[in-house]
Structure formats: structure tokens, C-alpha cells
């Protein structure tokens, strides 16, 4: 039975990784900076406590926040956790005197993790989780101002900033209980992902189609 569970976990991990790298989990202009919006870490019990479950050590819960908690893995058992997350984004504001609104829905996996005992009071844990997400598209129009020494020659220009992508975290850790109520843990983490950002400026045509683009 333990071998079957390990095989199932091994099959689901690449599927979850593929789903994560092909989806957008954020819709915010603030994600244009750095690696984007960071996700709340941990499994559901940890997230329900606001992500402060570092000290939580239970034989029935996989604690992704603290590798020392892996030492609580019960003998002859295998803990497997798979989490899903759905979010709704709604924004309403006035633009040029008109009310406009946007709404987005996302649904994706949040974490996949397992924990198993290596020996008495020695446990191993593995997790694959989305670390951060990028998703934005903003548009700005610079009106024509003939009195401006620069923009008077350029004319009306429109700017579009957009980006999407994500960063995924994979973690492998070991926890060892030295004595009662005292455990040590160590973990190795690896991050990967793709974030694409682009900037396009379209001025009023002077010659040709008047379009210039630059991708960063």
C-alpha cells in the first residue's frame, strides 16, 4: 500500500507542476514588481491560522513551514496532502467619468506534499507549491499637447504594460526528534518559473504605422 501511494504521488507531482506553470493566479498591477504576489505558504491547517503554524507538530498533518515537524511522522504510515485553491477578483472604479468593472476567477492547485518515516523519530517530507504569481495589464493614454516641446511632435501616445507568469517552489526536508518536545530539521528548496513582461508604446502615426514596441 505504501508503495502504491508513493507511485500515485510521483505521478501527480509532474501533472501539478505542469498545471502551475501554465496558469495565471494573480490579477494585480502590483505584481509588475519583482517576482509578483507571494502566495500564503503551508497546507490548509497552516493557512487557516494565517500562516503562523510553524510550531505545529502533528502526526496527522504535513507541516510545510517547519521541516523539524517531519519527525512526528508515525511509523508504518504515509501522509499525503493535495490542496486546491479558487479565488475571485473584482475591481470597480471610475475612468474618465465612467464606471468600469472587471472580474476574474482562478482555480488551481495550491500544494502537493507527502511525509513518511525513515526510522524511529526520523521523518522525511516533500512538497511542491506555487511560490508567487504575476498577472497584470494596464493601459495609459498621454493626450496630445501642442504646447509641449516634446509631446507636441510625438502626438497622442498610448502605453500598455502587461505581464504574466509564476514561480514554483519544491522542497525536500528531514526532521529528527532528539528528545521529547525537541526536534531538529533541515530542508533544501529549489525555485523555478517563467515571468514574461512587456511594454508597448503606440504614438499617433507620423510615418508608417507609427507603432514601436519593446519587450523586457
Language model: regions and residue ranges:
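N-terminal, post-signal peptide beta-strand-biased segments of exported outer-membrane/organellar beta-barrel
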Residues: 17-132
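Short hydrophobic "helix-edge" motifs at membrane interfaces and signal-peptide entry regions
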Residues: 5, 55-57, 169-170
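Well-ordered mid-protein domain cores that form the structural environment of catalytic cofactors
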Residues: 104-170
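Bacterial N-terminal signal peptides
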Residues: 4-14
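Extracellular loop and loop/strand-boundary signature of outer-membrane beta-barrel proteins
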Residues: 96-100, 155-160, 208-216
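Outer-membrane beta-barrel translocator domains and adjoining extracellular loop/strand segments
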Residues: 90-97, 137-145, 196-205, 210
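Short acidic/polar capping segments at secondary-structure boundaries
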Residues: 131, 177-181, 188-195
Amino acid at each position: 500500500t505504501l508503495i502504491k501511494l508513493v507511485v500515485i504521488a510521483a505521478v501527480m507531482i509532474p501533472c501539478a507542476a505542469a498545471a502551475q506553470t501554465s496558469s495565471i493566479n494573480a490579477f494585480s498591477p502590483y505584481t509588475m514588481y519583482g517576482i509578483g504576489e507571494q502566495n500564503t505558504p503551508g497546507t490548509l491547517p497552516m493557512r487557516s491560522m494565517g500562516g503562523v503554524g510553524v510550531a505545529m507538530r502533528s502526526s496527522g498533518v504535513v507541516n510545510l513551514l517547519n521541516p523539524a515537524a517531519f519527525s512526528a511522522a508515525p511509523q508504518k504510515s504515509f501522509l499525503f496532502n493535495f490542496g486546491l485553491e479558487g479565488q475571485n477578483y473584482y475591481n470597480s472604479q471610475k475612468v474618465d467619468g465612467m464606471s468600469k468593472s472587471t472580474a476574474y476567477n482562478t482555480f488551481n492547485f495550491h500544494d502537493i506534499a507527502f511525509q513518511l518515516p525513515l526510522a524511529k523519530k526520523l521523518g522525511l517530507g516533500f512538497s511542491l507549491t506555487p511560490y508567487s504569481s504575476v498577472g497584470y495589464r494596464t493601459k495609459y493614454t498621454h493626450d496630445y499637447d501642442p504646447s509641449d516641446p516634446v509631446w507636441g511632435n510625438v502626438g497622442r501616445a498610448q502605453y500598455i504594460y502587461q505581464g504574466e507568469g509564476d514561480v514554483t517552489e519544491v522542497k525536500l526536508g528531514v526532521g529528527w526528534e532528539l528528545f521529547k518536545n525537541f526536534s531538529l530539521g533541515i530542508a533544501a528548496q529549489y525555485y523555478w518559473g517563467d515571468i514574461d513582461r512587456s511594454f508597448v508604446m503606440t504614438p499617433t502615426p507620423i510615418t508608417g504605422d507609427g507603432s514601436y514596441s519593446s519587450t523586457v
